[in-house]
Amino acid sequence: MKISSGAINFSTIPNQVKKLITSIREHTKNGLASKITSVKNTHTSLNEKFKTGKDSPIEFALPQKIKDFFQPKDKNTLNKTLITVKNIKDTNNAGKKNISAEDVSKMNAAFMRKHIANQTCDYNYRMTGAAPLPGGVSVSANNRPTVSEGRTPPVSPSLSLQATSSPSSPADWAKKLTDAVLRQKAGETLTAADRDFSNADFRNITFSKILPPSFMERDGDIIKGFNFSNSKFTYSDISHLHFDECRFTYSTLSDVVCSNTKFSNSDMNEVVLQYSITTQQQPSFIHTTLKNTLIRHKANLSGVILNEPHNSSPPSVSGGGNFIRLGDIWLQMPLLWTENAVDGFLNHEHNNGKSILMTIDSLPDKYSQEKVQAMEDLVKSLRGGRLTEACIRPVESSLVSVLAHPPYTQSALIREWLGPVQERFFAHQCQTYNDVPLPTPDTYYQQRILPVLLDSFDRNSAAMTTHSGLFNQVILHCMTGVDCTDGTRQKAAALYEQYLAHPAVSPHIHNGLFGNYDGSSDWTTRAADNFLLLSSQDSDTAMMLSTDTLLTMLNPTPDTAWDNFYLQRAGENVSTAQISPVELFRHDFPVFLAAFNQQATQRRFGELIDIILSTEEHGELNQQFLAATNQKHSTVKLIDDASVSRLATIFDPLLPEGKLSPAHYQHILSAYHLTDATPQKQAETLFCLSTAFARYSSSAIFGTEHDSPPALRGYAEALMQKAWELSPAIFPTSEQFTDWSDRFHGLHGAFTCTCVVADSMQRHARKYFPSVLSSILPLSWA
């Protein structure tokens, strides 16, 4: 290392060194003029002193305080310090020459070069953050060299003593850093001094305002090889930056915003890293050390390098604190387990995936011993907090999502404490999700919650039948979840075989329809009817359906078919034609009821019924017409003379000359918010309404195979006629329009079955304007 003697900043030299220089001046001012050329250590005794005309060493003993201050590995090297003086001559004449200020500066430089730069790495490490010793040796916090066992990451440049005026404000430090970073970006090779930002002050600096956008971009420019030791980043914003091979030892990063900040191959030992709660995305630490660093409980440590911890005391923070060890890292804990602390520290399901549980678990698997030890310390803290079941209840899911998995299941202490927690969690799942769909499982749920539920059903096999709704959902998601492991799928299949063998289940599967048609599941295809749900009211009733059908009924779309299943009673198939889906779901299979009702409320056909059949004048008919929309077939028929006459009295005024009256047409447009819609949009809606009234007139609802209510046929045809007037383009062809019209009226020998007409029109609408059809046609008719 070259040191410019004239560039030493005297303010950085310890006072004891200044005193030493003063002492040297006093010893040499009497009669000697000298030129100081070097300072060196030696154990060699002086043979000669003050020989004029020759190089002569002058021996001075370093004060003990200086030796104690620098603490080199071998203190004997400071026992004697020799200053070589050239061309000493007698100057007893007047004007005796003292050592000049320039020579004093050179003595300072030489002393620092020998005793600081070359020998006292310990001092550099503790006081300035200079590089550790070569060969994988670093210096621990107790000033003892330690071998890192290959875990110490690449480090930033060592201390430079080149003189520069230190910036006086955070803004000046920011300007200096911007200049250095831009020079590096331009391809300039920076010196160690250029990259030395130790003791810098970046408080309240938003780095996105001082650096080009390329440094905040994904895979953008990198801040590489800088020394930020002993620096202050409090309240700064370093979000989206990438620091590589940088040193942050002894720096303060309190309340710093570091969303998506990357620290790679860096030394972040002895750092206060309590970043701001406004940090949205966790910072990442890749091949980075955090020895004795204080970390918030919401961090991702997946790339951290751990070393062996030593017996140092926990860090001191304002307001006090409670801490646990995670390897050689310190994790902050709450002083008391209050309700807010339980939620903030443990509930990652409520805090964007962040908790102390996830922080510990984020370490690589090779640190399983350290992870288990930290979790045991956490459990001890929770146990000592004497938390009630009510306090633990909101975080049961978060707790089992981590602690019910390896390696923590290897700990007897954790298993014993977690057992009751897992039992209460399972009971709550059974109570909550037996009658309603589970949330659509994401990766977290598939990998962390489903295996826990499988384990709970394995321990409590009776729950498979008593809570068939939940059990079948769990098996369904285990078999179809893309993020479920093969082990999870294998365990799910094995548990389902146990379920099928249960006396309440087995009578329903030997009918030549289940699974592979011989009573066994066929998991090779999602079309096989592998699932059998037991009625929540009657053990003799069961529903058999395929994987795809079960999935879509739990998470329906407007096109979902609600009758694509087998209904079993005492092992025999039962027709669903006369069964109302809503009643079936309400009574026997409530797991589908909420989804069915939610889809049903999006169907707006009933608004037209309320226009035609007001509850004040036609309350009974109104209820009959609406009730008929809840089933595929109705036992109520309206073909007797009294019914035909009553319907004619209601519908004839709406159809003067067989067409929709202008006033009634405007009522329809208003009810369906079509007043300002395009003619095509209006036509599509009228077409779908016509389809529904064709269904009313058919044998499936109010008609029979040989007769149907004329008023309903006429109204259906009038709706279709108006749709044709508005937009003929929505019809397949003019010939098809004429054919449908003839069928409604029985003209030209056309087949008059309106059930056929309704089906044909419905298929056309589903193909060309499905969203309109799905918003109108009753769900049971879809």
UniProtKB/Swiss-Prot annotation:
Q: What family is this protein classified in?
A: Belongs to the SopA E3 ligase family.
In alphabetical order, the GO MF annotations are: ubiquitin-protein transferase activity
A UniProt-annotated Pfam family: SopA_C
* Active-site feature positions: 753 (glycyl thioester intermediate)
Q: Where is the composition biased (Low complexity)?
A: 157-171
The record's subcellular locations are:
Secreted; Host mitochondrion
**One CC-aspect GO term:** host cell mitochondrion
Q: Could you say what a knockout of this gene produces?
A: Mutants are significantly less enteropathogenic that the wild-type strain in intestinal ligated loops and are impaired in their ability to promote polymorphonuclear leukocytes movements across the model epithelial monolayer.
| SUPFAM superfamilies in the cross-refs | Pentapeptide repeat-like (SSF141571)
Q: What protein does this entry describe?
A: E3 ubiquitin-protein ligase SopA
* Documented EC number(s): 2.3.2.26
Q: Which reaction does it catalyse?
A: S-ubiquitinyl-[E2 ubiquitin-conjugating enzyme]-L-cysteine + [acceptor protein]-L-lysine = [E2 ubiquitin-conjugating enzyme]-L-cysteine + N(6)-ubiquitinyl-[acceptor protein]-L-lysine
Please report the PTM annotation for this entry: Ubiquitinated in the presence of host E1 ubiquitin-activating enzyme, E2 ubiquitin-conjugating enzyme and ubiquitin.
Keywords on this record?
Host mitochondrion, Secreted, Transferase, Ubl conjugation, Ubl conjugation pathway, Virulence
Quote the Gene3D superfamilies the UniProt record gives. E3 ubiquitin-protein ligase SopA, effector protein (NleL), HECT-like ubiquitin ligase, Putative secreted effector protein
What InterPro entries does the record point to?
SopA-like_cat, SopA-like_catalytic_sf, SopA-like_central
Function per UniProt: Effector proteins function to alter host cell physiology and promote bacterial survival in host tissues. This protein is an E3 ubiquitin ligase that interferes with host's ubiquitination pathway. Required for inducing polymorphonuclear leukocytes migration across the intestinal epithelium.
GO term, biological process aspect, one: protein ubiquitination
Q: Does this UniProt record's set of keywords contain Ubl conjugation?
A: yes
UniProt comment concerning the protein's domains: Amino acids 100 to 347 are sufficient to target SopA to the mitochondria.
Q: Can the keyword NADP be found in this entry's annotation?
A: no
Q: Which domain of life is it from?
A: Bacteria
- Disordered: annotated span: 137-171
